[in-house]
């Protein structure tokens, strides 16, 4: 429970669930209020826990892509249900 309750984590998982893969800059643009430092920390934690994968292309500058693992997709489905239910209450 600690991981998903950490600020921005659910937002990141939900956003990653909306596409097959996404670059760091795209995530940051979508979540405009999150700092680069916090976003990087959350992505590292989610990767370490097996919820997301990370792919780095050796381009100049380096391009890094993120996506959900099967475990992450299960979590994203749960987050999506919560988001939809919350939207229905508003």
What are these regions (language model features)?
Residues 58-79:
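Basic, amphipathic "hinge/linker" alpha-helix immediately C-terminal to the N-terminal HTH DNA-binding motif
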Residues 47-57:
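A short, conserved structural fragment
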Residues 74-90:
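Short, solvent-exposed amphipathic helices
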Residues 1-38, 59, 65:
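N-terminal helix-turn-helix DNA-binding core of bacterial DNA-binding proteins
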Residues 39, 43-46:
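Basic amphipathic alpha-helical segments that dock to polyanions
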């Amino acid at each position: 429970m600690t991981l998903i309750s950490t600020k921005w984590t659910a937002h990141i998982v939900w956003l990653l669930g909306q596409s097959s893969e996404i670059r760091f800059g795209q995530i940051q643009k979508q979540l405009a209020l999150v700092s680069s430092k916090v976003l990087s920390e959350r992505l590292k934690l989610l990767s370490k826990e097996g919820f997301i994968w990370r792919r780095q292309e050796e381009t100049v500058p380096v391009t890094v892509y993120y996506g959900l693992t099967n475990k992450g997709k299960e979590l994203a489905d749960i987050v999506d249900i919560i988001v939809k239910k919350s939207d229905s209450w508003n």
